[in-house]
UniProtKB/Swiss-Prot annotation:
Keywords: Amino-acid biosynthesis, Branched-chain amino acid biosynthesis, Isoleucine biosynthesis, Transferase. It comes from the Bacteria. GO terms for biological process: isoleucine biosynthetic process; L-leucine biosynthetic process. This is (R)-citramalate synthase. The gene is cimA. It comes from Thermotoga maritima (strain ATCC 43589 / DSM 3109 / JCM 10099 / NBRC 100826 / MSB8). Residues 3-268 form the Pyruvate carboxyltransferase domain.
Length: 538
């Protein structure tokens, strides 16, 4: 059984609160979905805004390998000739191979929203579908609010489908627009629908009851051959069916022909691309494509996974382009530590006392407030230290930081930093002294310190110019202590090729930030040296 995937991220997904895709964003997403193997891409509603019109103009010259672009619109307006309906005429100008039309299935909407008669609504559906069949290879009919309409007035809801089928619709998509229908209802209603229409059926599920993916799978079980959804489940209110779950479930769990199986490995990257372009943080525990979808923390779990991953993983993470993560925390056992050390490329025997020493140190540090989830660079530096493999690239000699606020001016911070590097590093670069004492300003004390220490070290390690602080999180650990509370700072950094996290803990937020900053730069230098060594060996 072959299932067609219809992506509506660029229209329904863009209706999510706070999401607005630029034209360039839309084109990047379209290219990524085509590469993934998606069959249809709904580009937007040409009659609703200039940005969607620009998108359809832009894609006219693009040659997609897999997907067909669809333009979306409503049926003609009540009591208006189809040739005179502005929305329909704008839709035709999009010149897409597929037109998707939504019409009313629920008598409540016909009478209250459209404010027309039930008979006129049927004419609107027929006129629009039959007219558009003259201009496109394919017309998809979206039956808006179909399941609610069916429950309210079964006979009328079915009539709307029959009319669309008679007009020539290539697929009838049943929409759970309010997201209130449950899987068993989906199955029962589709069973009945199949007795009255012969056209292929599709499903468009919203997630207001948290069952959009389940409803989509239920529809397929009962014969739907067309599934609609969005990447990461983006959409209005609670979102749409998440294609990042729907697709692998159909392929890996139900054994259906959807996209090429080898293309599933691209799913993780597509999910993260859409998250980045939408400006919405990626949900870390999202099934299949979340960063922590295959993360293991408990020592017993890790021990079992080492023997056979099937013990705690429902699929191989690599099938969807993801990876297994072994977390380090106070819950970690020997298995976690061993696995992480091996991931870093260090050889260590299982019986080595160093393993238990590292585990003991982790538990001591976590008791002080350290947390190594999300700070794997700090964990690696700790391991290097305890294995005698931590190189000293620089020595911190001191810093001063102050915040200045004048009466009529914005406040700013100034930091001075003094560092020392090994003599041989200074000599190799032609510097007379291995010291650097410098200052920098920033909007706040942490930014000032960050700029100052980079300025000092870039003189000796030019590659640090590529490093940027990309995220900064602060957590107060013992709030009852008030202003004396211990602070944990988590910093995320990137050099354009890698991302890594470091952590610092102190009652002084500046000191905690300083620790995390220094470890971030030290980790970068370790990785640069490793990369250089690997290049020389190859």
């Amino acid at each position: 059984m072959s299932i067609k995937v219809y992506d509506t991220t660029l229209r329904d997904g863009a209706q999510a609160f706070g999401v607005s895709f630029s034209l360039e964003d839309k084109i990047r997403i379209a290219e990524a979905l085509d590469d993934l193997g998606v069959h249809y891409l709904e580009g937007g509603w040409p009659g609703s805004n200039p940005k969607d019109i620009a998108f359809f103009e832009a894609v006219k010259g693009m040659n997609f390998k897999n997907l067909k672009v669809a333009a979306f619109s409503s049926t003609r307006r009540p009591d208006v000739k189809i040739e005179e309906d502005a929305n329909i005429q704008t839709l035709i100008k999009a010149e897409t191979p597929v037109y998707t039309i939504f019409g009313k299935s629920w008598d409540l909407h016909v009478e209250k929203a459209l404010r027309t008669t039930l008979e006129e609504n049927l004419k609107m559906i027929y006129d629009t579908v039959s007219y558009l069949k003259r201009f496109a290879d394919e017309v998809i009919y979206d039956a808006e609010h179909f399941f609610d309409g069916y429950k309210a007035n079964r006979e009328y809801a079915l009539k709307t489908l029959k009319v669309a089928e008679e007009a020539g619709a290539d697929c009838l998509v049943l929409a759970d627009t309010n997201g209130g229908t449950l899987p068993h209802e989906i199955e029962e209603i589709i069973e009945d629908v199949k007795k009255h229409v012969k056209a292929p059926l599709g499903i468009h599920a919203h997630n207001d009851s948290d069952v959009a993916v389940a409803n989509t799978l239920a529809a397929v079980r009962k014969g739907a051959v067309h599934v609609q959804g969005t990447i990461n489940g983006l959409g209005e209110r609670c979102g749409n069916a998440n294609l990042c779950s729907v697709i692998p479930n159909l392929v890996l769990k139900m054994g259906l022909e959807v996209i090429p199986k080898e293309n599933l490995k691209k799913l993780f990257d597509v999910a993260h691309l859409v998250a980045e372009l939408s400006g919405r943080p990626h949900i870390e525990n999202m099934p299949y494509v979340g960063d922590y979808a295959f993360a293991h923390k408990g020592g017993v779990h890790v021990s079992a996974i080492k023997r056979d991953p099937r013990t705690y993983e429902h699929i191989d993470p690599e099938l969807v382009g993801n990876r297994r993560i072994i977390s380090i925390s106070e819950l970690s056992g020997k298995s976690n530590v061993l696995e992480k050390i091996k991931e870093m490329g260090f050889e260590i025997d299982e019986s080595s006392p160093k393993v238990r020493e590292i585990l003991k140190k982790i538990k001591e540090l976590e008791a002080q407030g350290y947390h190594f989830e999300g700070a794997e660079a700090s964990f690696e530096l700790l391991v290097r230290d305890m294995l005698g493999k931590r190189k000293k690239y620089f020595e911190f000699l001191g810093f001063t930081v102050m915040t200045i606020k004048n009466r009529d001016e914005e406040s700013f911070s100034e930091a001075t930093v003094k560092v020392r590097v090994p003599d041989e590093v200074a000599k190799r670069l032609g510097h007379d002294e291995p010291f650097e004492h410098t200052a920098a300003e920033g909007e706040g004390p942490v930014e000032a310190l960050d700029r100052a220490v980079r300025k000092a070290l870039e003189k000796f390690y030019p590659s640090l110019k590529d490093t940027k602080l990309t995220d900064y999180k602060v957590r107060i650990l013992n709030e009852q202590a008030g202003t004396k509370a211990t602070t944990r700072v988590l910093i995320e950094s990137s050099d354009g090729k890698r991302r890594w996290g470091t952590v610092g803990v102190s009652p002084n937020i500046i000191e905690a930030s300083w620790t995390a900053l220094l470890e971030s730069l030290e980790y970068k230098l370790h990785k640069d040296e490793e990369e250089m060594r690997n290049d020389e060996e190859n």
